[in-house]
Amino acid sequence: MSINVKVKIMTEKEKQQKGMLYQANDPEVLKDLYYCENECFEINQIPPSRREERMERLRKLFGKAGEGMFIVAPFFCDYGYNIEVGENFFANTNCVILDEAKVTFGDNVFIAPNCAFYTAGHPLDVEQRNKKIEYALPIHVGNNVWIGGNVVVVPGVTIGDNTTIGAGSVVTHDIPSGVVAAGNPCRVIRKLEE
């Protein structure tokens, strides 16, 4: 008796999307990365007098873009199609979204200058890291969130609805809804009144 088993070998891109370790310099992964790098460069060259053109290019680049989205140049992301923004999204200058995994922003999210959202992570094992092995975990930002200037959000973090993140924070773990949080690492300072 023989058993016929089919094993599907996952591509590096599929591993990336599932949060598994993947080869970051895989040709399929790099193709999308280089395409987006070029798109971001071109979008950032569009003058302020043609803002609507810039927003339209970003809407096409993103996986989802709600009404009222506005992003101040320069802006940078790795893939674009992993980014979903809700209604009335605003990101000030120098926003960086390394979207190796899904990054979702709810409605009425406001981001101050120089903020970074990193879904990409690297193994602590030096040999793996030196072989360009990475992993990616999603980031989720709820509705009605204000993120102060120079904030960094790391892989796998969720920020709840109606929350404010103070300037200069490094968000390394989930932050609940309805709070003010700040610091390095970011922690809840107080609950907001309902």
Q: Regions from the language model: what does each represent?
A:
Residues 1-68, 186-190:
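Terminal amphipathic alpha-helical/low-complexity segments used for targeting or macromolecular assembly
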Residues 13-14, 61, 131, 138, ...:
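Short secondary-structure boundary/capping segments
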Residues 48, 75-85, 90-158, 184-194:
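Flexible, glycine/small-residue-enriched loop-and-beta-strand segment within the central core
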Residues 57, 73-74:
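Arg/Lys-rich RNA-binding interfaces used to dock onto structured RNA substrates
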Residues 70, 79, 104, 140-142, ...:
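A generic "structured core" feature
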Residues 176-177, 182-185:
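Acidic, glycine-centered active-site loop in nucleotide-sugar glycosyltransferases
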